[in-house]
C-alpha cells in the first residue's frame, strides 16, 4: 500500500510577521519558526519598509531578515488586484487595509496558509487558511 505524503506549501507571510521579528514583538519566535521560504506581496514589502522609515530606520533595515528567511516577493499583478478588490466586502467590517487584502489575495491564489500577527484575521472565511501567531 502506497504511503500518502502531505506536501508542505510555502506560507504567505504578512508584513506583521516580519515586523514582529524585526522589532522583537510578541509572536516573533513563532514567526521565526514558520516563515522560512515564504512568499510575500510587494505591497507588504512596502508596508515593512514604511514601518522602518516611521522608526527613523532605512528602508533596507529589513533586508537581513528577509534574506535570512529566504522570503520571495510576488508582484501585485492584475490577478491579485482583482482578488484583493473582491475581498473588500468580506473584510471591511474588520478594517483590513489594502496591504492586508493583498496578502490574503496572494494566499488564495497560491492555495497557501497566511502567517500573521493580526488577531482580527482569526475568524475570517475568505478562502485560505490563516494562522495567527500572537
Regions flagged by a language model, labelled:
Residues 1-40, 52-64, 134:
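Short, well-structured N-terminal submotif of metal-dependent ribonuclease cores
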Residues 1-8, 104, 108-134:
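Acidic, PIN/NYN-like endoribonuclease modules and their adjacent C-terminal/linker elements
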Residues 2-3, 74-113:
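Active-site neighborhoods of divalent-metal-dependent phosphate/nucleic-acid chemistry enzymes
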Residues 8-9, 35-38, 70-72, 108-113:
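Short active-site oxyanion
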Residues 17-18, 44, 80, 102-103, ...:
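Alpha-helix capping/helix-boundary segments
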Residues 49-50, 66, 85-88:
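Amphipathic alpha-helical segments within well-ordered protein domains
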Residues 55-60, 71, 76-81:
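Ligand-binding grooves and catalytic loops that recognize ribose/phosphate and carbohydrate rings
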Residues 68-69, 82, 100, 122-124:
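Short secondary-structure capping/turn micro-motifs that flank functional sites
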Amino acid at each position: 500500500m502506497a504511503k500518502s505524503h502531505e506536501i508542505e506549501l510555502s506560507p504567505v507571510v504578512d508584513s506583521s510577521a516580519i515586523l514582529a521579528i524585526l522589532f522583537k514583538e510578541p509572536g516573533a519566535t513563532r514567526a521565526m519558526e514558520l516563515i522560512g521560504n515564504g512568499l510575500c506581496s510587494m505591497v507588504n514589502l512596502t508596508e515593512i519598509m514604511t514601518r522602518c522609515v516611521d522608526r527613523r530606520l532605512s528602508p533596507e533595515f529589513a533586508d537581513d531578515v528577509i534574506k535570512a528567511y529566504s522570503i520571495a516577493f510576488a508582484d501585485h499583478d492584475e490577478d491579485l488586484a482583482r482578488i484583493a478588490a473582491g475581498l473588500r466586502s468580506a473584510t471591511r467590517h474588520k478594517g483590513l487595509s489594502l496591504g492586508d487584502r493583498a496578502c490574503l489575495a496572494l494566499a488564495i491564489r497560491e492555495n497557501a496558509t497566511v502567517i500573521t500577527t493580526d488577531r482580527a484575521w482569526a475568524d475570517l472565511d475568505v478562502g485560505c487558511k490563516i494562522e495567527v501567531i500572537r
